[in-house]
């Protein structure tokens, strides 16, 4: 079997959820969209369900996957519904839905639900992606709150630049949210992962931790709080070939690396088809049997190459760690000019192995 694999530490996942809930000071929806950021939504939800207040996914397909796996906790559709007929499925499977556009407000008002629905009304407080304008938000609140098909409303918005700690935009969005929601008696939801880790003064009833659940730092620099996160995913493989090159010889496609000295080259079974960044630069750290070795040459579809010159005992079969506790996924992402989100979600071909039972 090909040695590339992703080890998922469900104890670390639970630890990170507890930290998020503690920082939020209220309830927390664990965001498990995009297959739990590449970690496996079903297994992650099953691991968290005994203590999670609920889950958040992007769409109804992701929610139904969890329901079919036996997850009974509340599930919120972050993008709401895309077609009118999805409302019947939302009611049937007892899902919560975001309402973020005028047409969704109209569709919900026209829907004769067999059971009252819990709705999260979304304000565009400055991100300008999804969300109602302040005027439409207030009108929707007045219209929906008295309808028999509505059980309760939660008021929410989404922070656009909370990962930029020197930016005033987060405070401006929080003020806009508070002003628009003034006088509305309902629970609120504002803070995402960077909001929880970087903006302690913000308060709401429901937080929505995503990236931090998986142990990744949303900020360029670590802090006392981000240091408490535990990486959930460790990506490993093995050396599958070793060769010695004389000075002046190139390595890989495009001869991007040329040996300046006699160089011992190790080939690792991990490539960009597995989710490793294709344009990782020469020198990107790779952990070979616990020792940092530099990446050399262009990353191929199925393989990458490392300089083993300073690691003479490494050989075929030696274990390799691409990210985990070291290098951390956020650090690797920054070095490769991509986001940690991309790396985690892009791990499609690598089999996952879970370190603890889902219901531990």
From Swiss-Prot:
What EC number(s) would the UniProt record show?
5.1.1.1
Cellular-component GO terms for this entry: cytosol
Q: Which residues are the active-site ones?
A: 33, 253
Domain of life the protein comes from:
Bacteria
Give one GO term, molecular function aspect: pyridoxal phosphate binding
Looking up InterPro entries in the UniProt record yields: Ala_racemase, Ala_racemase/Decarboxylase_C, Ala_racemase_C, Ala_racemase_N, Ala_racemase_pyridoxalP-BS, PLP-binding_barrel
PROSITE patterns hit by this protein: ALANINE_RACEMASE (PS00395)
Q: Which cofactor does it need?
A: pyridoxal 5'-phosphate
Q: Which GO BP terms sit in this record?
A: D-alanine biosynthetic process
Q: Which keywords appear in this protein's UniProt record, sorted alphabetically?
A: Isomerase, Pyridoxal phosphate
Which pathway does the database say it acts in? Amino-acid biosynthesis; D-alanine biosynthesis; D-alanine from L-alanine: step 1/1
What residues does substrate bind to?
129, 301
Question: HAMAP family from the xrefs?
Answer: Ala_racemase (MF_01201)
Sequence similarity: Belongs to the alanine racemase family.
Main function:
Catalyzes the interconversion of L-alanine and D-alanine. May also act on other amino acids.
Query: What is this protein identified as?
Result: Alanine racemase
From which organism does this entry originate? Xanthomonas campestris pv. campestris (strain ATCC 33913 / DSM 3586 / NCPPB 528 / LMG 568 / P 25)
From which lineage does this chain's organism come?
A: Bacteria, Pseudomonadati, Pseudomonadota, Gammaproteobacteria, Lysobacterales
């Amino acid at each position: 079997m090909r040695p590339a694999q992703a080890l998922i530490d469900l104890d670390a996942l639970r630890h990170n959820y507890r930290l998020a809930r503690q920082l939020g000071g209220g309830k927390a929806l664990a965001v498990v969209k995009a297959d739990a950021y590449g970690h496996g939504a079903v297994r992650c939800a099953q691991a968290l369900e005994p203590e999670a207040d609920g889950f958040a996914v992007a769409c109804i397909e992701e929610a139904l996957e969890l329901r079919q796996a036996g997850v009974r906790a509340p599930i919120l559709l972050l993008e709401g519904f895309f077609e009118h007929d999805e409302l019947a499925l939302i009611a049937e499977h007892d899902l919560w839905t975001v309402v973020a556009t005028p047409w969704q407000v109209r569709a919900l008002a026209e829907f004769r639900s067999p059971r009252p629905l819990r709705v999260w009304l979304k304000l565009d407080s400055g991100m300008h992606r999804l969300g109602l304008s302040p005027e439409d938000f207030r009108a929707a609140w007045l219209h929906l709150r008295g309808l028999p098909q509505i059980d309760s409303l939660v008021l929410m918005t989404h922070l656009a630049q909370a990962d930029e700690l020197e930016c005033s935009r987060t405070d401006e969005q929080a003020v806009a949210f508070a002003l628009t929601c003034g006088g509305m008696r309902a629970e609120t939801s504002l803070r995402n992962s960077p909001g929880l880790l970087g903006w302690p003064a913000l308060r709401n009833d429901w937080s929505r931790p995503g990236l931090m659940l998986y142990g990744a730092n949303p900020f360029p620099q670590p802090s006392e709080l981000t240091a408490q996160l535990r990486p959930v995913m460790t990506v490993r493989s093995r050396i599958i070939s070793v060769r010695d090159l004389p000075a002046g010889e190139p390595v890989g496609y495009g001869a991007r690396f040329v040996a300046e000295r006699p160089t011992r080259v190790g080939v690792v079974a991990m490539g960009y088809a597995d989710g490793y960044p294709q344009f990782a630069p020469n020198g990107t750290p790779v952990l070979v049997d616990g020792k940092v070795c530099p990446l050399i040459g262009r990353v191929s579809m199925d393989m990458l190459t490392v300089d083993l010159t300073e690691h003479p005992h490494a050989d075929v079969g030696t274990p390799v760690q691409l990210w985990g506790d070291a290098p951390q996924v956020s650090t690797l992402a920054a070095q490769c000019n991509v986001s940690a989100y991309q790396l985690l979600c892009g791990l499609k071909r690598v089999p996952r192995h879970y370190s603890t039972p889902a219901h531990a």
